Amino acid sequence: MTTAELTEMTELLVQYLQKNHFIQFDLKAVLFDMDGVLYDSMPAHDKSWQQTMDEMGLKHLPHEFYLQEGKIGQSTIDAVFQRNLHRDATDEEVKKIYARKTELFQQYNTGELIPGAIEILKYVQTKGLKPVLVTGSGQPSLLNRLEIHFPGVFTSETMVTAFDVQQGKPHPESYLRGLQKGGNLKPNQAIVIENAPLGTESAVGAGIFTIAVNTGPLPDSVLSEAGASIVFDSMGTLLETMPEIVRIIQTIRL
């Protein structure tokens, strides 16, 4: 990082501490979203949602499912139903639609990892920090792959999924649960790595310093407006910067 970039990063971290009334960080954990941060699965999610809604005769908006990323499935379905039919979906409709979406996702998902994801997780562990997964996903096919691709990194005790919360992102419940699973942490004892606006809102709402990585088609401004303190264009770029971010976090004090 250049001197100017280091200064800017320090200022962003100071602003976070001041806004949230902390004197310093006490970093213990890094909370990771899954889709779009660890796995390049969002194109498959988007395609399967679009096709499912098309088959149901329900209109959807450009990039709607990227913007809705992080919500639990029923909330995503209800948003489309409200706009098209002015009502929520019935339990039976939700079950049918989500089953079809899941079927299509399994066809389209390649299982590819986001470049840099493994390296960032390894770096986090070498620094003695705890990786915690915080995802709105309830897709068994993805959750089951975590142990294959990231052996020993995540356990049920360090994972928050759609099955663990009543209110999906952007409500802060997911990341508040992430703090609990990280060891009953305070917000200044963790940082978040997100890729989605709703996930960013959730993390910021939980009071955690939030880094966004824009791995999708949305403009950076959407993530900044959602509250991200800084936006990177890839996990690779974040990987290059991560040592300096951690160093500043561990030394800064108001």
Segments from the language model and where they lie:
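Asp-based, Mg2+/Mn2+-dependent phosphohydrolase catalytic module
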Residues: 1-27, 122, 138-254
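Active-site neighborhood of HAD-like aspartate-dependent phosphohydrolases
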Residues: 3-64
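Metal-dependent phosphoesterase signature
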Residues: 15, 81-119, 127
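Conserved phosphate-coupling serine/threonine residues in phosphotransfer and NTP-handling enzymes
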Residues: 37, 135-137
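Alpha-helical substrate-recognition element adjacent to the catalytic core
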Residues: 47, 52-85, 107
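Anion (oxyanion) recognition and catalysis
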Residues: 54, 125, 204
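Short helix-capping segments at alpha-helix termini
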Residues: 55-58, 85-89, 150-155, 184
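Short glycine/serine/threonine/alanine-rich loop segments
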Residues: 58, 129, 208
